Amino acid sequence: MIADSTTLRRLFRVPVVLLVGALILTAGAPAEPDSPTWHVYFSPNHGATQALVSALDAARTIILVQAYSFTSAPIAKALAEAHTRGVDVQVILDRRETGTKYSSADFVAHAGIPTLIDGAHAIAHNKVMIIDGETVITGSFNFTTAAERQNAENLLVVRDRALAARYVENWRTHAAHSSRYAGR
């Protein structure tokens, strides 16, 4: 039997009305709670170090760090304070940090923070922090005073569990071939 046009209109009317209604109801809906959020900072002198320190101060469970150059006292202090309040803090540094005069490598190692040296590459040029498995901080911004006060740098703070999981996986890959640093 072939349906007439009136029957066809009736059959399609309900799904179309439901679809249009759903679109209207969700048009102004807020983003999903797990939708990525981000903030970007630039330097010199536009708050990148303070943004980093604030994120570290808010950490609850774990902070994983990969740093090429690490001489910032405020960042090193924030990591040590997080460690003291029970946050699992672990650091991977480029091999040159063990001989740099103003490196924070000794400070964090002597604070009891597991510190690893990634000597498997020409340079371990990562500038990454992963906080609580949900926040990734990365960019050209080295964890140094010069990056905050003198250099043209960028720092991106992204809250996204899926992205953080990828960064954690990469962090673990580098940790596996790095060696423990006890400090000088």
List where the protein language model places each region.
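Signature of lipid phosphatidyltransferase scaffolds
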Residues: 131, 136-184
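Primarily the HKD phosphodiesterase
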Residues: 52-114
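Short N-terminal segments immediately surrounding and downstream of signal-peptide cleavage
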Residues: 31-52
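Structural recognition of the beta-strand scaffold that forms the well-ordered cores
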Residues: 39-41, 64-66, 90-93, 116-117, ...
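Bacterial Sec-dependent signal peptides at the C-terminal "C-region" and cleavage site
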Residues: 12-36
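Solvent-exposed loop/turn segments at secondary-structure junctions
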Residues: 62, 69-73, 95-99, 121-124, ...
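N-terminal secretory signal peptides that target proteins for export/translocation
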Residues: 1-9
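Surface-exposed, polar helix/loop patches in the mature regions of secreted/periplasmic/lumenal proteins
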Residues: 103-150
